[in-house]
């Protein structure tokens, strides 16, 4: 686990990241897709890009056309460049207090246990050699940091802000049509039946799996492989994303629940994620 931090620092240089954020010149029309990691960011990027381009797939990496603000400097991208279509769109995993202000924002929340397990599956084979770190060890170590929970509570007070679209991952899985309609309305894209069907198709698991080379962080992976990671490492972002199918021990789940009680409950008033999303009108309303 100590080696993991050293490896990841080769891809996520804090100095370059801070410089990238400082250089970003936001516009009021910009859309920043800002969930915590493994909470539907890539999926939402694809929905957004499909809507604004009516189905463009002429890109090698979704984060080239909807760039990740924090890594733009290390990847040599001009974060302030014009994009293929309007509105401009960006990815970020920053908490609300750190994200550049003056834009529109899409935040997606997801069950912290599912998100934590998905993070392990994503890291295994890319940043972690398979078999060297267990899911329990990885998730428990990260649970102690409380990063998911602090990100969650930073966005929660802004869930009803006019310039924030606050979505629930589990509701997206259950009703993608409603999700697409809400995103289209939020980014002010006229949505007819043809565009709705194209967007449903292009954001489906089968389509994104068929084109997974566009969603595997190719730019970031190539930079990592040039440093310390083995060639051919697996960084696919396209996973089924099933709800409640994590394989974690009771101790790990308990640790995540404790963090929720410590950090999230005092801010939201909800004792669990399940209780919180039950309060959110479904699907993706309210």
Question: Which residue stretches match the model-derived regions?
Answer:
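Short acidic/His-enriched helical or mixed secondary-structure segments at domain edges of catalytic enzymes
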Residues: 202-232
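Helix N-cap / loop-to-helix initiation motif
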Residues: 191-192, 249
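PAPS-dependent sulfotransferase catalytic domain
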Residues: 1-167, 229-286
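PAPS/PAP-binding and catalytic site of the sulfotransferase fold
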Residues: 42-54, 166-191, 207, 232
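Conserved ATP-dependent motor core of P-loop NTPases, especially the RecA-like helicase ATPase domain
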Residues: 198-199
């Amino acid at each position: 686990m100590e080696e993991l931090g050293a490896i990841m620092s080769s891809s996520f240089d804090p100095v370059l990241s801070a410089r990238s954020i400082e250089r970003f010149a936001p516009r009021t029309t910009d859309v920043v897709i800002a969930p915590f990691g493994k909470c539907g960011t890539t999926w939402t990027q694809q929905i957004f890009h499909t809507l604004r381009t009516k189905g463009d797939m002429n890109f090698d990496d979704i984060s080239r056309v909807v760039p990740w603000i924090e890594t733009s400097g290390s990847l040599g991208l001009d974060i302030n460049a014009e994009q293929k279509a309007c509105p401009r769109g960006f990815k970020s995993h920053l908490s609300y207090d750190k994200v550049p202000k003056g834009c529109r924002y899409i935040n997606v929340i997801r069950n912290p246990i599912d998100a934590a397990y998905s993070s392990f599956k994503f890291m295994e084979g890319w940043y972690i050699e398979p078999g060297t770190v267990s899911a329990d060890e990885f998730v428990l170590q990260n649970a102690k940091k409380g990063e998911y929970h602090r990100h969650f509570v930073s966005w929660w007070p802004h869930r009803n802000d006019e310039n924030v679209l606050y979505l629930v991952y589990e509701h997206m899985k259950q009703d993608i049509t409603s999700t697409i309609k809400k995103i289209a309305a939020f980014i002010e894209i006229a949505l007819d039946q043809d565009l709705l069907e194209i967007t449903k198709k292009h954001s489906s698991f089968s389509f994104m799996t068929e084109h997974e080379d566009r969603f595997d962080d190719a730019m970031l992976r190539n930079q990592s492989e040039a440093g310390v990671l083995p060639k051919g490492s697996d960084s696919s972002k396209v996973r089924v994303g099933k709800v409640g199918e994590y394989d974690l021990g009771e101790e790990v789940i308990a640790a995540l629940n404790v963090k929720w009680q410590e950090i999230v409950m005092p801010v939201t008033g909800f004792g669990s994620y399940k209780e919180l999303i039950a309060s959110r009108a479904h699907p993706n309303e309210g």
